């Protein structure tokens, strides 16, 4: 069989633990037999990040700027336990955080819907995509533990020395304070990424915050979204037959529970972090959730929405069999290959990505699945496969 050719490489970011094992299986069984795969490879495994003082993460992000499309394996974000386990020089930052900041991107997470894995919310029929702003808020905050009575203020000092002060609280005892920030240009990039993604997928866009309480911080998000929509996207949305809709975050949650899905829900950083896990769990499994980082500059980075599956990896190291769900990692590859095909005018490559996704879904819908799905499926007597056999079953379906 003649392999599908590629003209431009993908940026390939390898990762850690069980997902790294699955990564190689997916390439060996589902990609390399069918595609003359061209990638520029970066090893983002924690050991190599430590060896390079995390320079490899920066290099991979710069390569994504050069080539436009990347695919990333799940990676470890180290904590104190990992510092000891891997004998790290320092507690390296989250690779995802570094890449997001360098690409100025927005993360879109979408559940993979299959028959037999029913959402907890009965009326959800179509995927709900969460768009998470990837800068600032609590993730770039400053915090002070207040030891006792005193006055806490927000102070802004302009370049000319002028000060603006706002009282936070007069403390009569111990407490805690937190300062957060965001940037207009980052919010603008977030808004444009959301509007562009809505147009490309032809889905309605919702944005929600709490501007009634946060009259300056959250209201700034609301205003920027509305200004950009009115100036740049109102006519395009009307032509595409889609809508932009703003509401309060609590109202959005109530509406989500009654909706049937099929839209994009844009959230601030923390809201998106929480709500994407809620939506993925309610649709069935975090292992059935795709994630794509979209930059307003035209860069795309695809990955699974879940972590490195640490417990399965430790069992794998002991020689024990695992039944690890590889679907989201497969869909990271298909998303990247499809986008590469679109950007290069390579219809054959994009068509292969579609075929592989259909083969993956068909395998599950035929009753062959990993243990996590077997525990939640409505099918009777599903066949539980181990990690490798599940991938081999997909290959068998792909070759039909």
Describe each PLM feature range.
Residues 6-25, 29, 154-247:
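Glycine-rich phosphate/diphosphate-binding loop of Rossmann-like nucleotide-binding domains
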Residues 35-41, 201-209, 233-246, 341-353, ...:
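Flexible, glycine/charged-enriched surface loops at secondary-structure junctions
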Residues 134-135, 140-191, 198, 343-346, ...:
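Glycine-rich phosphate/pyrophosphate-binding loop and the adjoining helix
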Residues 256-355, 359-366:
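Glycine-rich phosphate/nucleotide-binding loop
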Residues 47-159, 163, 270-274:
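N-terminal glycine-rich phosphate/adenylate-binding segment common to multiple enzyme folds
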Residues 2-8, 18, 22-23, 28-53, ...:
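N-terminal alpha-helical transmembrane segments of multi-pass membrane transport
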Residues 46-60, 222-263, 267:
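N-terminal small/polar loop signature for handling phosphorylated ligands or for N-terminal nucleophile
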């Amino acid at each position: 069989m003649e392999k599908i050719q590629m003209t431009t490489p993908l940026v390939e970011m390898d990762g850690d633990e069980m997902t790294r094992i699955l990564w190689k299986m997916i390439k060996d069984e589902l990609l390399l037999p069918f595609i003359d795969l061209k990638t520029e490879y970066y090893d983002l495994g924690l050991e190599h990040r430590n060896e390079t003082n995390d320079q490899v993460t920066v290099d991979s992000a710069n390569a994504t700027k050069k080539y436009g499309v990347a695919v990333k394996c799940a990676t470890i974000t180290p904590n104190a336990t990992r510092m000891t386990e891997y004998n790290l020089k320092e507690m390296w930052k989250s690779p995802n955080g570094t890449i997001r900041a360098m690409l100025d991107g927005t993360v879109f997470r979408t559940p993979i819907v299959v028959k037999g894995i029913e959402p907890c919310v009965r009326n959800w029929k179509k995927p709900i995509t969460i768009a998470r702003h990837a800068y600032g808020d609590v993730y770039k905050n400053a915090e002070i533990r207040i030891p006792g009575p005193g006055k806490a203020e927000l102070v802004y000092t302009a370049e000319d020395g002028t000060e603006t002060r706002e009282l936070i609280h007069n403390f009569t005892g111990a407490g805690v304070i937190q300062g957060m920030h965001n940037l207009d240009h980052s919010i603008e990039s977030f808004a444009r990424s959301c509007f562009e993604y809505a147009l490309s997928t032809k889905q309605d866009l919702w944005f929600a915050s709490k501007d009634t309480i946060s009259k300056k911080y959250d209201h700034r998000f609301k205003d920027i979204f509305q200004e950009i929509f009115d100036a740049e996207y109102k006519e395009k949305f009307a032509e595409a037959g889609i809508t932009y809709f703003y509401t309060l975050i609590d109202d959005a949650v109530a509406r989500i529970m009654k909706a049937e899905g099929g839209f994009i829900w844009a959230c601030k950083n923390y809201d998106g972090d929480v709500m994407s896990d809620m939506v993925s769990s309610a649709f069935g499994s975090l292992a059935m959730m795709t994630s794509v980082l979209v930059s307003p500059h035209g860069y795309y980075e695809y990955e699974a929405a879940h972590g490195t599956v640490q417990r399965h990896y430790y069992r794998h190291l002991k020689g024990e069999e695992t039944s690890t769900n590889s679907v989201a990692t497969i869909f990271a590859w298909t998303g990247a290959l499809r986008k590469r095909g679109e950007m290069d005018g390579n219809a054959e490559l994009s068509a292969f990505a579609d075929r592989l996704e259909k083969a993956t879904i068909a395998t599950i819908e035929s009753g062959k699945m990993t243990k996590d799905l077997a525990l939640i499926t409505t099918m009777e007597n599903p066949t539980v496969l181990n990690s490798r056999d599940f991938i081999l079953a997909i290959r068998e379906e792909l070759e039909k």
